Amino acid sequence: MARSAATWDPGQYLRFGSQRLRPALDLLAQIPLDAPGRVVDLGCGAGNVTAILRGRFPAAEIVGVDGSDTMLARARATAPECRFEQADFFGWEPRDRPDLIYSNAALQWVDGHPTLFPRLLSFLAPGGVLAVQMPAMHATPLHQVSRELAASGEWSGELRDVIPLPGILPAMDYWDMLRPRVASLEMWQTTYMHALQGEDAVMEWASGSGLRPYLDRLSEARKAAFRQAYAEAVRVHYPRRADGTTILPFHRLFMVARMAGERAIA
C-alpha cells in the first residue's frame, strides 16, 4: 500500500545537497547502458539528478516522476528540457516501456515492496534496467529517536497517528525477489561518513527527510519545539567532533537489475 506523501521543502532537503548527491552519482556510474531511449527518474524530487541524467544520456527522452507538486515545480525549473509527471509510485505507469527506471533515495518512503518492485520490472523494455538506491537507516538513532520522541508523553497526543517510515526489507529479500525475474542483478551496500557542518546538523538533515511526517502534523511553534527536542536527544548519538564537524554514518543499499533482451551494453 502506498503511504501518504509528506510535505516537502526543497530548500531544506537540498541544504546538504552535495552529501545527498554522491550516492546518486555512485548508482549512476554502475548503470550498464550506453544509449537508452527512454529514462524515468522515479521519485525525482527537485530534479537535480534528473538534470544529471540528461547530461549522461543526452539523446534520451527523460521523464521525472514525483508525488510532490512543490518538488516538481522546483524540478521543472532545474531541468526544463525534461518532462515531469505527478504520480505516486503505485499509481504511475509509463506511456512507453522505458529502458531505464532510476530511483535514488525514494522508494524507502513506501511499503509494499514485494508488489512494487516486480511491477516496476514489468514496465521495462527488453534489456532494460531498474537501478535503485535506498537508505538503510531504520534501525539507527537517526530514526529511532524520532519514533521514541513521538511516542513520549509530551508529543503522543499530536503525533500518535503518524505512521513511521516502514524501513526497507533485508537485502537478501530483494535478491530473492528480483533475481528470478532478471538476467543479471548487482547489489551492494555502502556506509557514507557524511561530514555535516553547522549547529545541530543531524537535526537539520532529518528535517529535510525523515522528520517530515512528524513536522507536517504540528503548528509552526510546535515544529520548532519538536526539532529542538529531537536535536537534544540525537546529539548524544552523533556528537560534534573537535573541529566542529558532525559525522553521520549513513548506510545505503544499491541494486541494479537488468532484464533479458538486447540493449546497448557498455
Task: Annotate each language-model stretch with its function.
Residues M1-G37, N48-I52, M71-R74:
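Conserved class I S-adenosyl-L-methionine
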Residues R38, G128-V129:
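Short glycine-centered segments of the SAM/dcSAM-binding site in methyltransferase folds
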Residues R38-P94, T115:
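Class I SAM-dependent methyltransferase SAM/SAH-binding core
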Residues A46-N48, V162, P166-A266:
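Conserved Class I S-adenosyl-L-methionine
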Residues Y102:
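A conserved beta-strand element that flanks and buttresses the S-adenosyl-L-methionine
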Residues A105-A106:
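Short catalytic micro-motifs in class I SAM-dependent methyltransferases
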Residues V110-D111, L124-P126:
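Helix-to-beta-strand junctions that scaffold the AdoMet/dcAdoMet cofactor pocket
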Residues P114, L121, V129-Q197:
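Conserved catalytic/acceptor-binding region of the Class I
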